[in-house]
Amino acid sequence: MIEDFNFDSIQIKIPQRSENSHKGDFGKVLVLGGCKGMGGAAILSSEASLFCGSGLVHLHTHSTNVEASLKRNPEVMTLGIDNDYEIFDGIDVVLCGPGLKDDEWSYGVYKQAITINDKHALI
């Protein structure tokens, strides 16, 4: 059965944010992913986090993806990682996986993600 879609029939209740609120009040998301040549998934995931209302979004991706991320979403704080690194404090939610494959770089990112035990994580 096919029906016409009517936007007026949808009641979306988006809570109003206070005029004196700060983006840091609405959660900090870290997206880990995007190995060399597969940055699109991680870039789109970070963009989706923004559209869902996250206050601050960080993307840690392969260094070859940094320029594309910053061109598409300059509001996403993008860091190029090529070696082992530590996930910094202050993050509320971690998403690990978009754009990873079966290679050494992806395994290193995954190893860091599974050490997270004090944050909400989707791996």
Predicted regions and their residues:
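Small-residue (G/A/S/T)-rich helix-start motifs and N-terminal tracts that mark the onset
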Residues: M1-I123
